[in-house]
Swiss-Prot record:
It is an enzyme of class 2 (transferase). It is found in: Cytoplasm. Monomer. PANTHER family: NUCLEOTIDE KINASE (PTHR23359). This is Adenylate kinase. It comes from Shewanella halifaxensis (strain HAW-EB4). ATP binds at residues 10-15, 123, 132-133, 200. One of its GO terms (molecular function) is adenylate kinase activity.
């Protein structure tokens, strides 16, 4: 069961990824984790990646594909894997396909931009403990204060509305074209493509995903 998750930042992919991993016992493949592990292990690709990163440059698609290929060949991926956050672009998807990494299911979690902005820009964090609140969905007992310590809550830079909108712009420009790309692959019968309404409850989305994967 080789699964890829698609959706904008804040659409709830992380929550569903966790659910799929636990339900089906497949590992999540994150390119960030892979890079760190390869660098730590000192593999040839890891050393190459370290050189590039130490120079402050972006790791090339070829290098990332090489790491993904190495990773999916490991024993824990025998029953499948879950890709989240990769591929991000059509060239990456093409390179992945031509290197023989096939997918069975593409799952898109769809949430309108304004809902994502509401979700993410409403988050408030207690810096000392990492406790997370939300001005709409999970309010603190006293506005702007941590329930336990009474200290001030803060907005993470990542959750500032302008930052959220910037990330959404990048998603629409680079990653959203993959929706059409994998739609075309699915039309040829090479993969199943399913789109879920991410504004529903977490449990509802999980149930719908299970119905498709079973």
């Amino acid at each position: 069961m080789r699964i890829m998750l698609l959706g904008a930042p804040g659409a709830g992919k992380g929550t569903q990824a966790q659910f799929i991993m636990e339900k089906y016992g497949v590992p999540q493949i994150s390119t960030g984790d892979m890079l760190r592990a390869a660098v730590k292990a000192g593999t040839p690709l890891g050393l190459e990646a370290k050189k590039v990163m130490d120079a402050g440059q972006l790791v090339s698609d070829e290098l990332i594909i090489g790491l993904v290929k190495e990773r999916v060949a490991q024993d824990d991926c025998a029953a499948g894997f879950l890709l989240d956050g990769f591929p991000r672009t059509i060239p990456q998807a093409d390179a992945m396909a031509s290197s023989g990494i096939a997918l069975d299911h593409v799952i898109e979690i769809d949430v309108p931009d304004e809902e994502i902005v509401k979700r993410m820009s409403g988050r408030r964090v207690h810096p000392g403990s990492g406790r997370v609140y939300h001005i709409v969905f999970n309010q603190p007992k006293v506005e702007g204060k941590d329930d336990v310590t009474g200290e001030d809550l803060a907005i993470r830079p990542d959750d500032e509305e302008s930052t959220v909108r910037k990330r959404l712009d990048i998603y629409h420009e680079q990653t959203k074209p993959l929706v059409e790309y994998y739609g075309a692959v699915a039309a040829k019968g090479d993969v199943t493509y399913n789109k879920f309404d991410g504004t529903q409850s977490v449990a509802t989305v999980s149930d719908e995903i299970v119905a498709v994967l079973s």
